[in-house]
A protein has these predicted regions:
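Non-catalytic connector elements of ABC transporters
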Residues: 1-69
Length: 69
């Protein structure tokens, strides 16, 4: 996956908490660092995120984006 954003990392999903419209996703990028991102419930379901998944996180000035191959 190639992106224009320069602030990115690879990590492991440690939790996914789905609510009615959003999901709170915690990604461990390097122990003890964890990044938390709120994404839409639709995005969480589309990515089929679950604990243990390897994901890429992209950090922009106003948001954290999560991607999965």
């Amino acid at each position: 996956m190639r992106l224009s954003a320069r602030n990115s990392a690879v990590g492991t999903v440690v939790s996914v908490e789905e609510g009615a419209i959003a999901a709170l996703v915690r990604v461990e990028i390097k122990e003890p660092f964890t990044v938390t991102s709120m994404i839409t419930k639709d995005a969480s379901e589309d990515l089929k995120l679950k604990t243990g998944d390897k994901v890429a996180i992209i950090i922009k000035s106003t948001e954290v984006i999560i991607g999965k191959d």
